[in-house]
Amino acid sequence: MVSLVPCGFAQVLCTNPLDIGELRNYKSKQCVDIVGNQGSGNIATHDCDGLSDQQIIMCGDGTIRNEARNYCFTPDGSGNANVMSSPCTLYPEIPSSQRWRLGRKKAFTDNGGIEQVATEIINLASGKCLDVEGSDGTGDIGVYDCQNLDDQYFYIRSRGPELFYGRLRNEKSDLCLDVEGSEGKGNVLMYSCEDNLDQWFRYYENGEIVNAKQGMCLDVEGSDGSGNVGIYRCDDLRDQMWSRPNAYCNGDYCSFLNKESNKCLDVSGDQGTGDVGTWQCDGLPDQRFKWVFDDWEVPTATWNMVGCDQNGKVSQQISNTISFSSTVTAGVAVEVSSTIEKGVIFAKASVSVKVTASLSKAWTNSQSGTTAITYTCDNYDSDEEFTRGCMWQLAIETTEVKSGDLLVWNPQIIKCTRSNTAPGCAPFTKCANEDCTFCTDI
């Protein structure tokens, strides 16, 4: 079994997250959701909606939190009842009822061809599993005796690597794919290209095309992959997945084939203007689109020393800071998020897709504003008590190709080591020893 709890010390904010994303139930494929949208209260499964209360943080202190509010998953009682999103008890230490570990695993391949790994999530106080009330994997979430049933397995969903990010410009009209209205919800049509997030999309290995404004998927009205196209919550269904075969490309302009119907993304009429739907692939320019984006260099990740003590514990105030010569606009924030998700270099090697996805989510979350916190090294990642050593804060650097401007981001992500040599393990991985020279995936 893999432990979710490398350390038991309290974190006001989660400064060493192990994973961030949609936590889905293996049986129903629905998302773990905090009822309402404030991040507090009853926990149940729900259709995935892309909102922050469904962005779950698996924290290195053993707690499970959500991005909408810094609350902990807490069984109502002594670890034997319904689970709530409640204030974390931090002092004198986190109680075992708010700490969790991972149990048995089940690997499977989803509809997009991406391998997922679902695990049991076990409460330390009761030794019972996170469990969905309904045997179909829908309903309220509590804890129950571990029975190795599908509704007791959960996974942070991966879409695979991000392949493209930007606006989609039509070859015929030079107009861009646009979500009608200003909220990034509803019908999709062609419109003059502009720097609004409802025109920016991410394209993933599993075939999903996700709108940057609302985190929803390009979706065909008919479940058979035929009909009008809009954006809708991402359901892990083939009518929301698209391929981009080279046979349907003309230079940088390519057609998108719906995986359910094998029909092409098509603009109504023959001028490349108007509403968007699917139609038989005809090889005409109104069915071809080009990715238009601003380039950033591949980001690099390093650990910077923030304090050492060879005779005791290290305490430092940790802030989230961004250094950039220009304003970090909403457009720049999304570009950087996409750049991070496409790949990060640490110690001259590329980090895993899981690490880049989690870093991208951490970057996006940091844009809403954070407060400085005082953090103390009480334990090493290996769960041994911290007796001496150094604290390290993560730094991410990338350069905008067009302007040459450097952006440096120092998030509230830290590691504590015995050595005064920088940790050898990437963020969102675990140090297997006190000097952090050996690493394990979480």
UniProtKB/Swiss-Prot annotation:
Write down any Gene Ontology CC term.
Golgi apparatus
Q: What is the effect of changing I413A?
A: No effect on oligomerization. No effect on lactose binding
What is known to happen upon mutating Y26A?
A: Weak N-acetylgalactosamine binding
- Cofactor(s) needed for function: Ca(2+); Mg(2+)
Q: What is the effect of changing K342A?
A: No effect on lactose binding. Decreased antibacterial activity toward Gram-positive bacteria S.aureus IFO 12732
Superkingdom to which the source organism belongs? Eukaryota
The UniProt entry, under SUPFAM superfamilies, shows: Hemolytic lectin CEL-III, C-terminal domain (SSF111265), Ricin B-like lectins (SSF50370)
Query: What keywords are annotated for this sequence in UniProt?
Result: Antibiotic, Antimicrobial, Calcium, Cytolysis, Disulfide bond, Hemolysis, Lectin, Magnesium, Metal-binding, Pyrrolidone carboxylic acid, Repeat, Secreted
Question: Would the keyword Calcium turn up in this protein's UniProt record?
Answer: yes
According to its UniProt entry, one GO biological process term is: defense response to Gram-negative bacterium
Q: What is the effect of changing K415L?
A: Autoaggregates and cannot be refolded to a soluble form
Q: List the molecular function annotations (GO) for this entry.
A: calcium ion binding; fucose binding; galactose binding; lactose binding; magnesium ion binding; melibiose binding; N-acetylgalactosamine binding; polypeptide N-acetylgalactosaminyltransferase activity
What the entry lists under InterPro entries is as follows:
CEL-III_C_sf, Ricin_B-like_lectins, Ricin_B_lectin
- Quaternary assembly: Oligomerizes in the human and rabbit erythrocyte membranes. Oligomerization is induced by binding of beta-1,4-linked disaccharide ligands such as lactose, lactulose, N-acetyllactosamine and phenyl-beta-D-galactoside, but only a little by N-acetylgalactosamine and galactose, and not at all by melibiose in aqueous solution in the presence of high salt concentration and pH 10. Forms heptamers that assemble into larger 21mer oligomers, which may be inserted as a transmembrane pore to the erythrocyte membrane.
PANTHER family membership: N-ACETYLGALACTOSAMINYLTRANSFERASE (PTHR11675), RICIN B LECTIN DOMAIN-CONTAINING PROTEIN (PTHR11675:SF126)
Kindly provide the name given to this protein in its UniProt entry: Galactose/N-acetylgalactosamine-binding lectin CEL-III
Species name = Pseudocnus echinatus (Sea cucumber)
Ranked from the top, the taxonomy reads: Eukaryota, Metazoa, Echinodermata, Eleutherozoa, Echinozoa
